[in-house]
Amino acid sequence: MKQHVNRYLFRLFGMLLLLAVCPFSAVAADEATEEQEWRDELCQELDRLCASPLFETTQLGLCVYDLTADTMLYTVNARQRMRPASTMKLLTSITALSVLGGSHTFQTTLYHTGAVNNRVLQGDLYVVGGFDPRFGKDDLYAFAEEIKLMGVDSIAGTLYADVSFKDTLRWGEGWCWDDEAERLTPLLYQGKDCFMEQFVRALGEQGIASAGVTGQAVCPADAFYITKRAHAIDQILMPMMKESDNLYAESMFYQLAAQTGVPYASARQAVNYIRSLIRELGYDADLYRIADGSGLSLYTYLTPELEIAFLRYAYQHNPIFTHLYPSLPIAGRDGTLKSRMKRGKAYKNVRAKTGSVSAVASLAGYAQASNDHMLAFCIINQGLVKLKSGRDFQDAVCEVLCR
């Protein structure tokens, strides 16, 4: 009798357990089915877009990755090397945030030699450039005011610019003569190569006389510190990404180069940091060509797959993502995407870096799908006669991703 009761209780417990588990299993099965249907529908829609006659005469590279599920969703020519245009700024910014960190600052520092006698500085001034593209009027006049506070009415020596932060090349490798890019110099005033001229003027407005003699020299190790002005990395990152500012991108690029501690650091040293991260992500750095930090160069060639790898890396590293994501243009709202995707599902649900050079339009970043999955995508259209045709295709892809 006791065995009968035990057997009955065991069967009853099993039935109750099955009833308890089955609803959850059914829900999980339903969710899995919905996920598969979503993926199938997304891929079918992308297939339809990629069947456009546009690609009979142009080249397409497309890669879509589901960051939430950590799986590849869709690819077309994802390993074909193409010109990234300004989506190169993604690799520059992600590498910089990885190497420099979110607390890095862009600094310009003021030093002097000699001593102050009878309100005359019997020595020289040195402005040490740190390639800060945001250095402006307030910063310059703060320098002049600090000198005035030293009790200086006159400078007997020379005003030196220390531009040893980077090499002496004024433009990037492979830039076109008609790009109209700003000159690359470690000492900038409002983004222009006119620092020392404006510094002499600011000193004069503070009542500090000088002979106006300027030159270039490396600041002596025993020079006396006066003050510095600095801007946070986010202050550089926002214009670089939102407005695709090439000068800001090259400044970020050369911050990497300067980490070597070598005077007159070159673009090659910055490239080595990016190549190092490429290898860390499991790719062969020799399969790609990187010439600058902005994407202006004719010599830079990447793949959509590699850009996705960088976007995935940033997403998985919160100290990077918390700086990168807010800096990206928002579809239909701001930056270089302000006038694109102003309606539909993609509106406000896409944050991505745009790119355009002759015959090339690109777009890479993040899209929030309707099922709350975060997607990373990279689209490169190459061989375009009219860039608008590529951008229209990209916007259509984003609309599909956000459905």
Indicate where each model-derived feature is located.
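Active-site-adjacent, His/Asp/Glu-enriched structural segments that form or flank metal-binding
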Residues: 105-167, 175-182
